[in-house]
Amino acid sequence: MSNKPLRIGIVAGELSGDTLGEGFIKAIKAVHPDAEFVGIGGPKMIALGCQSLFDMEELAVMGLVEVLGRLPRLLKVKAELVRYFTENPPDVFVGIDAPDFNLRLELDLKNAGIKTVHYVSPSVWAWRQKRIFKIAKATHLVLAFLPFEKAFYDKFNVPCEFIGHTLADAIPLESDKAPARELLGLEQDKQWLAVLPGSRGSELKMLSQPFIETCKKLQQAFPELGFVVALVNQKRREQFEQAWKEYAPELDFKLVDDTARNVITASDAVMLASGTVALECMLLKRPMVVGYRVNAVTAFLAKRLLKTQYVSLPNILADTELVKEYLQDDCTPDNLFGEVSRLLEGDNHQMLDKFTEMHHWIRKDADQQAANAVLKLIEK
């Protein structure tokens, strides 16, 4: 490599990507303090000197309708970035997550002779598996959080590096209930069930009723049990309060506008919607049950498109049903009540020991591994 400072093109599309970008930039700068980063970043990346050509908010659009409305602007941003990077070629381009935007950008840059990396594998192993060919065309390397993702890429001879999961690095191997309870103002000497009905409006719409009715049954069976609910923002809080009023106004829920992490840490067992939060719960070593419902159309499509036997990451990782999953018509108060009761009364050692083992599998200092893999690619 020449004496010129390293130049890395980088695009993060949302807050989670900004956090990954921050860790990656720190790890690169530890080896190359004068490295330059340019593209699109959030506040954390910008604080480390990343030059952001556009506001990250431009890319953080969810849902088909919103995306269609923003399409002309998104295409303009992409065209500007292609022009900028072809005129000022970086040593490598790293697209963090945001696959709909980044893979298209990576394809154009790869065709222009720039080395490209996609950081965070899309869920190709789970559905729309043909996307892997598009990913192969667009990238020189994929950085994957989970070992089964790398195994999938290997099957198709697509270069992929398993770097471990940043959450597994961030969460200690053991987590103590008492400080979390103190922080949330929960009584220390009673049992608590964490209730996590999801972060999206559509999830709360589907799950508030079965989750609240499950708590109603639990209250009768375990009069001393406390219920603590994690809600990501004011909108979700209002939505849950509405359902609470409707289905069980007599129940005493403790609502918390805090991260799921503190609420899970404070609890004895967890009832949750599927998603990254199931992985977090596994890493915090709390027994859990997964309940999930989607609308009929999505369910119909998922049945045909999903290629995995399970929906929650702990089960996919273990390749067995460690955690009970109640989906669609099985997501009933009776089923959830039965499993939560078992978790509260039973011995969960086997489940929790496996959680610890899996934590070790994916705890590899992902920031450092990502930096190493990218530096190796630059030197090729």
Curated annotation (Swiss-Prot):
Gene: lpxB
Protein name, as recorded: Lipid-A-disaccharide synthase
Described purpose of this protein according to its UniProt entry: Condensation of UDP-2,3-diacylglucosamine and 2,3-diacylglucosamine-1-phosphate to form lipid A disaccharide, a precursor of lipid A, a phosphorylated glycolipid that anchors the lipopolysaccharide to the outer membrane of the cell.
GO cellular component, one term: membrane
Species the sequence originates in: Vibrio vulnificus (strain YJ016)
EC top class, as a word: transferase
Alphabetic keyword roster: Glycosyltransferase, Lipid A biosynthesis, Lipid biosynthesis, Lipid metabolism, Transferase
The keyword Transferase belongs to this UniProt entry's keyword annotation: yes
Family: Belongs to the LpxB family.
